[in-house]
């Protein structure tokens, strides 16, 4: 069976995702499409708008054959680690092709850029450090400056959000298994972070979440496939944002000592002190980010750091594993064929997982389900089995 892998958040699953999924199957001639999906919290350092099990249902209803969870310790980090670990899981599960959307849309250019970085790794790292010192800027900007300086302006624009992820997928594949074929299509219509829904049927997940959180589900439904609309209408829990967790974060920052926070993943350069001061002044999470912001810290980095503090995520990361959130018959058949040749632990029953392997994931789910209205999902990692569909 020919397998194509995709890396997703489905926050929530919308028409753009449906187009991407259909193209992935069509253009790669895949027998099975496997999605590695973020769980309770997503890469920009935010809670997912609804629980991972509901988003898994959306994925399966739309035609994904298998949904595998990207562990929270990787799903909530910067693009390099996010991509590295997603590709590691897809490689372990033996996908032939990695398919992704990007602003650029030409997979060969991503591969070429990745090869150049691998071949010039020492020079590239040195250029990044020089940019950090000379310009006193964020790591992301220093990375982009170093890339342009060494490889020119025209190779690939890694300032665009999906190009950044695509480049890091290509880099991870180049380092881990260059035989994985890359395939990319250009994103259509909505930009990744567009906050307004301006097109007939395609809008960004950001714009769709904005509508849903404002209670405008009917308006948001114009940009969602029928299967997602049905799941959203049947969902009895709340739609979530940082608003639901702000008081927990505020308490954590006020209660903890500065030295205690130094050991949290992503905390550096004394940023915890700014955060602790802001926590006593901010009225809400948006205020908090504005009060904490500096030239060296992007909003996304601040959100990720705040999330790691909320989750009490220590600097060490967990080991990778394959945690099945859901599958259809095709996915079950594929897993049965390859199970013996998969090098990472496969988890379908959490209670049978190796001791300690899921510790961070379980804590993240428990914190996520503290939000009012999620009582039915508390301890869900234990009592909600993988979702199986015909």
From Swiss-Prot:
GO terms for biological process: tRNA modification. It comes from the Bacteria. Its main location: cytoplasm. It catalyses: cytidine(34) in elongator tRNA(Met) + acetate + ATP = N(4)-acetylcytidine(34) in elongator tRNA(Met) + AMP + diphosphate. InterPro entries: Rossmann-like_a/b/a_fold (IPR014729), tRNA(Met)_cyd_acetate_ligase (IPR008513). Pfam families: HIGH_NTase1 (PF05636). GO terms for molecular function: ATP binding; ligase activity, forming carbon-nitrogen bonds; tRNA binding. ATP binds at residues 7-20, 101, 162, 187. Its EC number is 6.3.4.-. GO terms for cellular component: cytoplasm. The keyword Kinase does not apply. It is found in: Cytoplasm. Keywords: ATP-binding, Cytoplasm, Ligase, Nucleotide-binding, RNA-binding, tRNA processing, tRNA-binding. Belongs to the TmcAL family. PANTHER family: TRNA(MET) CYTIDINE ACETATE LIGASE. NCBIfam families: PRK13670.1. Catalyzes the formation of N(4)-acetylcytidine (ac(4)C) at the wobble position of elongator tRNA(Met), using acetate and ATP as substrates. First activates an acetate ion to form acetyladenylate (Ac-AMP) and then transfers the acetyl group to tRNA to form ac(4)C34. This is tRNA(Met) cytidine acetate ligase.
């Amino acid at each position: 069976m020919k397998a194509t892998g995709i890396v997703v958040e489905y926050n929530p699953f919308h028409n753009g995702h449906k187009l991407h999924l259909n193209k992935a199957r069509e253009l790669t001639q895949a027998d099975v499409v496997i999605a590695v999906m973020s769980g309770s919290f997503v890469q920009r350092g935010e809670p997912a708008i609804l629980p991972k099990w509901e988003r898994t249902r959306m994925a399966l209803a739309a035609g994904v054959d298998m949904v595998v969870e990207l562990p929270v310790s990787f799903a909530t980090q910067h693009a390099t680690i996010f991509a590295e670990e997603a590709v590691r899981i897809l490689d372990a599960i033996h996908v032939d092709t990695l398919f992704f959307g990007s602003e650029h849309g030409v997979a060969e250019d991503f591969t070429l850029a990745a090869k150049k970085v691998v071949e010039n790794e020492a020079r590239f790292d040195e250029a990044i450090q020089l940019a950090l010192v000379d310009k006193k800027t964020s790591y992301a900007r220093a990375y982009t400056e170093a890339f342009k300086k060494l490889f020119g302006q025209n190779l690939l624009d890694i300032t665009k959000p999906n190009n950044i992820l695509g480049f890091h997928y290509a880099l991870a594949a180049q380092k881990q298994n260059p035989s994985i074929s890359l395939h990319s299509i250009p994103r259509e219509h909505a930009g990744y972070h567009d906050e307004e829904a301006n097109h007939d049927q395609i809008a960004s997940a950001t714009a769709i979440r904005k509508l849903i959180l404002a209670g405008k589900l009917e308006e948001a439904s114009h940009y969602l496939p029928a299967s997602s609309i049905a799941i959203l209408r049947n969902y009895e829990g709340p739609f979530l944002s940082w608003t639901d967790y702000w008081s927990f974060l505020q308490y954590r920052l006020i209660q903890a000592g500065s030295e205690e926070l130094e050991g949290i993943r992503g905390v550096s350069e004394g940023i915890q002190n700014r955060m602790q001061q802001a926590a006593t002044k901010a009225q809400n999470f948006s205020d908090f980010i504005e009060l904490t912001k500096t030239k060296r810290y992007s909003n996304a980095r601040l959100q990720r750091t705040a999330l790691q503090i909320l989750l009490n995520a220590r600097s060490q990361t967990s080991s990778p594993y394959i945690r099945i959130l859901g599958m259809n018959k095709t996915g079950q058949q594929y897993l049965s064929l390859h199970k013996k040749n998969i090098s990472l632990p496969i988890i379908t029953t959490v209670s049978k997982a190796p001791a300690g392997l899921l510790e961070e994931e379980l804590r993240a789910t428990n914190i996520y389900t503290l939000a009012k209205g999620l009582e039915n999902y508390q301890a869900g990692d234990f009592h909600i089995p993988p979702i199986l569909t015909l």
